[in-house]
Design a protein with these regions (language model features):
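Basic, polyanion-binding surface patches
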Residues: 1-161
């Protein structure tokens, strides 16, 4: 059943995002996710999920602030790098710090600076709900990074065919 469920979930195409935090040493760390969702406009809330066994769980669960960075199609290299277990460090030339201390990745289609609103244990994951303090978006006509059936994919906007 688990394999069938994984394949069924994979048929839902999603965008790709990086969750980012700063450690006590001010080093930025990030993790690739595709479980991002908007929750509410009033109050401004968003959500994302993290597997309990993630090597980033301790770091992300301990932080009261985080940012969500929606990746553009040309940022696949960053998605790949931060999806793998390892140190998850984001280099200083890859981001700026926002007004609410969020790690804002250069080139992202959108960035959200958040405070943890709620953490919910949900099976083998934790559901994080963030209160959005600031949202930034790219006005350039760039394509998002899309994940579908276990691979990156391109978005074709209806009418562009």
């Amino acid at each position: 059943m688990q394999q069938e469920l994984r394949k069924a979930f994979g048929n839902f195409g999603t965008g790709v995002a990086i969750i980012a935090v700063r450690g006590g040493d001010q080093q930025a760390y990030g993790l690739t996710i595709n479980s991002f969702a908007s929750v509410s406009l009033q109050p401004a809330l968003l959500s994302w999920c993290l597997a309990n066994e993630s090597d980033m769980m301790a770091r992300l669960a301990a932080s009261e602030k985080f940012s969500v960075n929606i990746l553009a199609a040309d940022q696949q290299y960053l998605s790949n790098r931060l999806a793998k277990p390892g140190d998850h460090k984001i280099t200083a030339d890859e981001y700026t710090i926002g007004a609410h201390d969020g790690v804002l990745l250069h080139g992202a289609l959108a960035n959200f600076e958040c405070r943890v609103h709620e953490k919910i244990n949900a099976g083998d994951h934790v559901l994080f709900i963030g209160a959005v303090d600031a949202a930034h978006y790219c006005s350039e006509q760039r394509q998002p990074l899309i994940y579908f059936r276990g691979a990156y994919s391109n978005l074709q906007v209806a009418g562009d065919a």
